């Protein structure tokens, strides 16, 4: 800031525009104060804070940006260049604060590094040049290299494009000049001169007005000061060195990098606001779960179905969805009501139709408030939607959260789009030649600067584009084929000539014969690469003829880029290449895409020494040897895993043989897979090597004996009941080994799987014992022994058949009562526990209460029956009391109550998805799961694969007495998102034990199936995998499946199942380390 003496020195005694005063420009030298155009800032009402006079049309910045206007600001600290068109000399000044320090050049500056050029001379607050001269003045944030200085000095068109031409003679003559004005008005026109320093109105720009002492800490340690403050000063600080009080003018220069950076800072400020509004990871997860819950529990409209006046307001869309959901639910109830009224002879539209009236009222609200009326097609589609989730969610809390969230975000997305469009418009207008804003792409430091700058731009630009349309536009802007801006040229050293050279060289490669569909074509392709003379040999690429033809003209820019990447810009280069890759890579198959992607490899080869590619001249021979070894190992695995009809079952050593072959395969793929193109740097090459280290594990399973139905042998209702209970027992015991393994306790009261198995088996025994007791009861009743005690009847009866009937009756009742008490106690305990489970619906819990009461009462009857039997055996109650009529009546009533309970638990049972929703973030019974667990639980439900066993013919009948043989076929159906991905799969088959007796029976060993032999198909847009397993249909099949998560590919869902019957297998979830699988590509084969 100026002191009183400086202010007095610059006091205005002459008015340059007053014809009666002495003209201050009648001096040999005129003072010139350079300032710059900068985008203005705006208040909350959108009004510019420092607009230039609208009537004065001479002020015009470099870029034409909608909704943005220019003001004037001080120059950033940097460099100023003045070419005296009259004297034909170029001068260099360093800009620091409000001081311009002249750099004096000697005669040998051309060979010096840029930072060592010249020596500091006199410092003043303005430029001083003869009043009759014409000047070209230009600003540069980065110091011009000598190449740029020579170019600007010799190239008139570039000089006029980059520098501001100022005719001092013209200004002296008429007092006007484009982009210039009298120095005395400096404070009136320049926004950050004379403004109170505490009002940092430019904080969201690349040059905030913070005091110097604060900003020095903020930028300390940064290599390139992309954001650096410029302290506010008074006009006297600039006017103090004028040759005569008002003998001076200020001239506005262009600073295109500052303009672009200002727009970028404003743009990122809006992005930061949105990020803050979205919140932390927890808040974002709540938002994600809210949207998911809306999708599950409410009717969501497609974008084209939403009324136009509602589309732009997410809160109105939320209200519309809620209204439509309520209307559809009411309309469904009205339809049920209508059928009910019609069945009773009432008119469905009369006073009885209350739900119909409510539905009509809600439809009228939809038409009035939202101008929306559902079509019949929409109603049919929505009726299919499961609305059972509605009662599981805290909708009021969810709606309040969304309304609050949308309110915070309101307008931010539109502002981000607006500021993004402004930034991209300016950046595209910046052009493709760094020379036009004073940057030298042949200089290492300036290459590093441009890489650092564009990497920052790319980070944000590539993150804010999400919809398909904006991504397509961005891909065109960043195209390698036809670049629109410098970000697209970053990979070729910001040189359009280098970009065109790469493209021309690639296009010169003949594509007529190339195909990559089979190994022989790959050999032809490898030969073509070698003949192309691009990647071959041990010579450096720069020595190739094609390089001298195409790249040598742009070799200096590549050399500078290579040095920058090797030194200070390594991280920036990596960031730029990673960010550009999705937009410059060609993901589609075919030769054109392959050739297009070779450009990126070629660029890496030119820039990074460790990325230099070399062609493998022995590729064809190595590929042939690899195929021979691969086929031999696969045959070895096939022989060990796949039995041919008639062969003896494999012994233990065959599993070891398969494991050995698998290890050989892994070693072959990891160490001997031939590479057509390799990196010379071995450390870098290792990142491309993939090793296969799959662990083989046989899934063992205890032998299970199948039982045939005995209903025909037992006959009647009792036989049928026994068969049904036997089937239920087999169903429960099917996967008991795996179910029990989920619980650490062997206490049946603590282990539901074990308890279920015991009481299911017990009920079967009870029914079988009751059948036996019933037959004996008939014989006892015929002999008239029911009124006697069991002891008396046994002692007095002489008939052998009657005595056997009494003994059978006693043993059967003892078995029935004992097992019945145990089974009833276990089932009562389980039902009572489920009754206390708050995650179940009220009616489902009531059903379990009925079951608990019924089984508890049943247990009491068994208890009484058991002790009545004991009493009758010692001379107490009669035989009739052991199986009294009230007991039979009790069992009948209990059966009805139990049946009602079963119906309630099945009809009103919550689905797994309903239970998950009730325990999720917005559920009424939220379990407050961690983020990962909540999403994983959902993936288990939504993307659970389907496994099915079916019987197929293994060997056809050879003659009339030969019925042939069957084998299992496994069918695996996967979610559609897994197409082309790698899953884990392991299939084992446990042969059935021989039915005939063997004195020394060998242990049955599971057989590992080669999953690569299966076939894929697409059915209903889902991948379906089928494989025949060999053996017989009596074998037990075990399957382990590992699927990558949709939201996190590094994690996986794991399932296992086993079965011995045709039909769908029961999949069980497994912990990550519980099962072993082998890799299988979905859809390949």
From Swiss-Prot:
Coiled coil (UniProt feature): none
Protein keywords: Host membrane, Membrane, Secreted, Transmembrane, Transmembrane helix, Virulence
Annotated transmembrane regions: 753-773, 813-833, 860-880, 884-904
GO CC term, one of those recorded: host cell membrane
Top-level taxon: Bacteria
Region (Disordered): 1-20
Pfam (any one): VasX_N
CDD domains according to UniProt: MIX_IV
Topology within the bilayer: Multi-pass membrane protein
Disruption phenotype: Deletion of vasX gene together with deletion of vgrG3 fail to kill Escherichia coli.
Localisation per UniProt entry: Secreted; Host membrane
Matching InterPro entries: Toxin_VasX, VasX_N
Primary site of residence: secreted
Keyword Glycoprotein: no
Tagged with keyword Transmembrane helix: yes
Role: Toxin secreted by the type VI (T6SS) secretion system that acts on prokaryotic target cells. Acts in conjunction with VasW, an accessory protein to VasX, to compromise the inner membrane of prokaryotic target cells.
Name the UniProt record assigns to this protein: Toxin VasX
Protein source organism: Vibrio cholerae serotype O1 (strain ATCC 39315 / El Tor Inaba N16961)
